[in-house]
Amino acid sequence: MATQAKRPRVAGPVDGGDLDPVACFLSWCRRVGLELSPKVSERAGGRRTRGGARAALTSPPAQVAVSRQGTVAGYGMVARESVQAGELLFVVPRAALLSQHTCSIGGLLERERVALQSQSGWVPLLLALLHELQAPASRWRPYFALWPELGRLEHPMFWPEEERRCLLQGTGVPEAVEKDLANIRSEYQSIVLPFMEAHPDLFSLRVRSLELYHQLVALVMAYSFQEPLEEEEDEKEPNSPVMVPAADILNHLANHNANLEYSANCLRMVATQPIPKGHEIFNTYGQMANWQLIHMYGFVEPYPDNTDDTADIQMVTVREAALQGTKTEAERHLVYERWDFLCKLEMVGEEGAFVIGREEVLTEEELTTTLKVLCMPAEEFRELKDQDGGGDDKREEGSLTITNIPKLKASWRQLLQNSVLLTLQTYATDLKTDQGLLSNKEVYAKLSWREQQALQVRYGQKMILHQLLELTS
C-alpha cells in the first residue's frame, strides 16, 4: 500500500454531511464485524457487535484510538494503554475488504476478467472503486469518508512537470512518474473507459474521468494491500490489491511497531514491539527508500530516520564510466563486448540500477560481476567468454559489504568511484547546497512542503553516494 506521512485527510470523497466521520466509521466497523479496541467502540457509542471477526480472536484487541490527535499526519491510531509485543490491535474479516471480488459488481468483473487484464493488474479493483464511489447505497460509504480528499493527494504525479523535474532531478522519481502517467492513460483509454461506456447503468458520467482515474490509481498505490504469496505459490501471478479498512489508517515508519498478518478468514494487525500509552501505532509498507515513498505514497521520512533509504547507480552509468577510461576504438569495442556478455548473463540491463544502501549493496551479485567483467584483463575475459560464463564461480568473499569496499581491487574501486561521480552530476544541486538548506531551520521552514520532501530525498541519496566516494578513494 501507504514524517508528514499520509496526506492530510481533510475531507472524504463522499459527502457525509455534518456527521462525525470517525463515529460513523466505528459504527460501520461494528456492523461488519471489524474488531477494534473496546475503548474505540465506546467513544463512538453503541454496543459492540458479536460474530464476524470476533470468532477469530484468541484474546481481545489492545486498546487503541482512531484519532487525528497525537499522530504524525491525518488520521492514525494511538495506543490508549500500553501495548505489549504480540498483542492484537484489530482484526478485519475478509468480508469487510473492498476488492474486485467483494464489491457489488464482483460477478461482472469476474466474467470480464480476461478483457480487463492489464500491465498493472489493478483495473478490476479500480473499476470496483469507481462504481462504489458513486453508488448511493454502497456498503463502504462510511469507510470512504475517512479517505483523503482525492484532489489533494501529494504524489509527484500531481505536481506540475517542471516542478517535479526541478525538485527531483537525479532521484529517479521523474522517470518513474512519466512511465506511470503513460501506463495510466493507456489503461484508461483502452480498457477502463470502454468498459464503463458499455455499462452506463453502473458508471455515471461523473466517474468517467481520466482525472478521477489518476487519483484512484494514486490512492490504490498508497493505501491498498497485496497479500503475499505462500512459498509454494511463488510461480503464480501476484495477488490482486485490496483495500483494507482500519489497516490503511496506520501511518508508515521504517522502525514500525505493528504488522499485518493474513489468515484464511481475516487479517490481523499485531504489535511487533512494546507501544507505550499515548504513542502512535505504525505499520510498514516494506523496506522502502525515500524515493519510493514519495513516488508511491507522497511522503518521505526525514534524514536520517529512514534506515531503508538507498541510492541508485544506473547500470548504463557504470558502462559510461568504463568507456571514459578507454583510449582507443579497440578498447571501446571491448567494453561493449563485455557489456553484451553481462547482458547475456542477465546481470545488467539498459534500464536497470545498482542499489546501494547505508550498510549494504542490495544488488551485490550484479555489481560484483559487473565490476569483475569490466575490469578483468582482456585475455581473462576471452577465457571467461569462451567458457560461456561458466568458469570460475568463486565469489569475491565479503567484497561488497559497505565496510569491505576499501578492500576491493584498485581497478574496481576506480570504476565504482567514477560511476558515483557521474551519478552525482545528474542532480541539479550538490551535497553542500542541500546540507545548507537542511541545517538552517529558518530557511528550511520557509520551503514549501514539496521542496522539503524533495530535499530529504536528494540529501539521503547523496549522503549514501558520498559515503561510497570516501570508501573508494
UniProtKB/Swiss-Prot annotation:
Regulation of activity: Activated by automethylation.
SUPFAM superfamilies, A to Z: RuBisCo LSMT C-terminal, substrate-binding domain, SET domain
Top EC class for this record: transferase
An annotated Gene Ontology molecular function: NF-kappaB binding
Catalytic activities: L-lysyl-[protein] + S-adenosyl-L-methionine = N(6)-methyl-L-lysyl-[protein] + S-adenosyl-L-homocysteine + H(+); L-lysyl(8)-[histone H2AZ] + S-adenosyl-L-methionine = N(6)-methyl-L-lysyl(8)-[histone H2AZ] + S-adenosyl-L-homocysteine + H(+)
Keyword set, alphabetical order: Methylation, Methyltransferase, Nucleus, S-adenosyl-L-methionine, Transferase
Superkingdom assignment: Eukaryota
Keyword Transferase among record annotations: yes
CC annotations in GO: cytosol; nucleoplasm; nucleus
Record PTM N6-methylated lysine, positions in chain: 39, 179, 372
Main localization (coarse): nucleus
GO biological process: negative regulation of NF-kappaB transcription factor activity; peptidyl-lysine monomethylation; regulation of inflammatory response; stem cell differentiation; stem cell population maintenance
Subcellular location: Nucleus
Domain SET per the UniProt entry, residue ranges: 60-286
Post-translational modification as stated in the protein's UniProt record: Automethylated; Lys-39 and Lys-179 serve as the major automethylation sites.
Residues where substrate binds: 122, 224, 226, 262, 297
InterPro entries with a match to the protein in the record: N-lys_methylase_SETD6, Rubisco_LSMT_subst-bd, Rubisco_LSMT_subst-bd_sf, SET_dom, SET_dom_sf, SETD3_SETD6_MTase, SETD6_SET
Binding-site list for S-adenosyl-L-methionine: 73-75, 223, 251-252, 297
Pfam families: Rubis-subs-bind (PF09273), SET (PF00856)
Function of the molecule: Protein-lysine N-methyltransferase. Monomethylates 'Lys-310' of the RELA subunit of NF-kappa-B complex, leading to down-regulation of NF-kappa-B transcription factor activity. Monomethylates 'Lys-8' of H2AZ (H2AZK8me1). Required for the maintenance of embryonic stem cell self-renewal. Methylates PAK4.
Subunit structure: Monomer, homodimer and homotrimer; these structures are stabilized in the presence of S-adenosyl-L-methionine (SAM).
Family: Belongs to the class V-like SAM-binding methyltransferase superfamily. Histone-lysine methyltransferase family. SETD6 subfamily.
Descriptive protein name: N-lysine methyltransferase SETD6
Species of the source: Homo sapiens
